[in-house]
């Protein structure tokens, strides 16, 4: 009889524990909150070329601290803007955006990428390494190009279109080279993801055809030219997916496409938009195929328009992407850089509206903002909105590629509001979190470093209330979470 009662109590206890946990769609607890940091043309970092090592580091720490104050938990850092590198590479020269001349290393030498990753992870934030797959020379009239740049070594791989030079996406050797670059990054650095933006085939220049006819004639594979171009992009994405996950299975692969996949007037699967150029028809990036085939782990469509826009309405597009994520992680790209550009973007409610809208949809897991410098002057008071309302509590990043199950933490009271915490096993641990439930709403009350052994709730800013419930969880390196343990 005692055994039966004990079993019943254990079952009831497990049921209550299960009910206590928020769903994975609870945006107050689980949410990606990222910022793009562009290095091309020194948009965000470093502020200008030729800064001292100390100034480069100081600027980066300042922007990280600003984003952390705003509640961000990830950065998307551009490390390969134009066939170059913001890190030491045997494959590509140092970027001109660092020291002012392509091929010129910092002096005295240091590795900016290793530094940036360390500082980012120190703050509990993810580091997504953003690379441009096809742009090779940003401006053929002005850009510094080193003798060791790949355009000098293999000029036959490149075409000029407008004032830029591009890797020719139709040449298999280009795919192979890009895979070598990515494998080098993934194998040498503790990044959390490889990230690519919307620049596949370039946006069309009116009256000019992209000059890839020779490559098409040489290797058309029986396809018409438009399908051949899409096939080229499909091939490199499929290969990169394999390269990344074979090198380090836990590293994510994400794409941030232009906001319109295809207009409904061209395809019944498309959005009710009037995009002048689209991913599928102009950039030859079939994002839906990549999601459907599982070739990418997350997608961040750039929805840089306001709600109510007459050609590309934010509401229409955010709903469309919510319905076309194919089970992959979906975050929304916000055009915070547009603050003040028209009446809609002078409205302080625009970004709050966009956040509320995406949080109301089940398949959207967060936001990414373009770009870092836009936050410097608190546009429309949006820094305040994030700090005081939308991101007032920290959030746990979504678990995209978990490689192991996280062990349940152990917690014991040592006196007052002081506790000893830890885990019994040796699984890689990223952090602990205190989850609270207040008036039916879950939130993350505090994130705690993985090496913490003793915590004090008052010191963490967690003021316990009798009407609330509190739990401790352990978070793994890939953001997987343990069972919830009630805090006594």
Q: How does the language model describe each region?
A:
Residues 58-84, 188-191:
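Catalytic domains of carbohydrate-active enzymes, especially glycoside hydrolases
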Residues 70-107:
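Aromatic-lined carbohydrate-binding/catalytic grooves of carbohydrate-active enzymes
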Residues 72-73, 80, 123, 152-295, ...:
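Polysaccharide-binding and catalytic clefts of secreted carbohydrate-active enzymes
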Residues 284-310, 326-401:
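Substrate-binding cleft of secreted/luminal carbohydrate-active enzymes
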């Amino acid at each position: 009889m005692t055994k039966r009662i004990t079993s019943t109590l254990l079952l009831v206890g497990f049921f209550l524990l299960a009910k206590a946990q928020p769903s994975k769609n609870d945006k107050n607890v689980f949410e990606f909150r990222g910022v793009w940091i562009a290095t091309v043309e020194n948009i965000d970092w470093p502020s200008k070329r030729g800064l001292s090592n100390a100034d480069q580091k100081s600027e980066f720490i300042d922007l990280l601290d600003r984003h952390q104050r705003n509640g961000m938990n990830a950065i998307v850092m551009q490390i390969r803007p134009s066939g170059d590198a913001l890190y030491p590479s045997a494959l590509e020269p140092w970027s001109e955006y660092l020291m002012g001349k392509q091929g010129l290393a910092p002096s005295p030498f240091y590795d900016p990428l290793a530094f940036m990753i360390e500082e980012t992870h120190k703050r509990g934030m993810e580091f997504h390494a953003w690379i441009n797959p096809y742009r090779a020379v940003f401006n053929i009239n002005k850009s510094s190009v080193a003798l060791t740049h790949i355009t000098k070594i293999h000029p036959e791989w490149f075409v000029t279109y407008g004032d830029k030079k591009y890797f020719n996406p139709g040449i298999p050797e280009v795919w192979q080279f890009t895979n070598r670059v990515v494998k080098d990054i993934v194998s040498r650095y503790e990044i959390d993801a490889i990230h690519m933006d919307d620049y596949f085939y370039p946006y069309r220049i009116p009256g000019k055809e992209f000059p890839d006819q020779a490559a098409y004639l040489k290797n058309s594979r029986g396809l018409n030219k438009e399908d051949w171009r899409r096939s080229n992009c499909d091939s490199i994405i499929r290969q990169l997916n394999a390269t990344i996950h074979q090198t380090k299975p836990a590293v994510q692969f994400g794409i941030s496409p232009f906001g319109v996949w295809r207009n409904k007037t061209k395809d019944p699967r498309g959005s009710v938009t009037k995009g002048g150029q689209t991913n599928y028809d102009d950039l030859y990036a079939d994002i839906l195929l990549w999601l459907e085939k599982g070739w990418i782990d997350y997608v961040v469509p750039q929805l840089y328009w306001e709600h109510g826009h007459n050609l590309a309405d934010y509401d229409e597009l955010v709903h469309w992407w919510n319905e076309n994520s194919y089970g992959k992680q979906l975050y929304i790209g916000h055009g915070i850089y547009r603050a003040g550009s028209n009446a809609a973007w002078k409205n302080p409610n625009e970004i709050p509206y966009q956040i509320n809208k995406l949080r109301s949809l089940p398949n959207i897991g967060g936001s990414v903002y373009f770009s870092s410098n836009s936050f410097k002057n608190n546009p429309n008071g949006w820094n305040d909105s994030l700090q005081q309302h939308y991101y007032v509590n920290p959030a746990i990043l979504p678990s995209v590629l978990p490689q192991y199950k996280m062990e349940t933490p152990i917690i014991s009271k040592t006196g007052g509001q002081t506790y000893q915490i830890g885990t019994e096993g040796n699984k890689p641990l990223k952090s602990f979190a205190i989850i609270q439930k207040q008036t039916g709403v879950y939130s993350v009350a505090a994130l705690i470093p993985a090496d913490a052994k003793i915590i004090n709730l008052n010191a963490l800013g967690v003021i316990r209330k009798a009407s609330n419930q509190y739990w401790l969880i352990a978070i793994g390196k890939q953001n997987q979470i343990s069972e919830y343990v009630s805090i006594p």
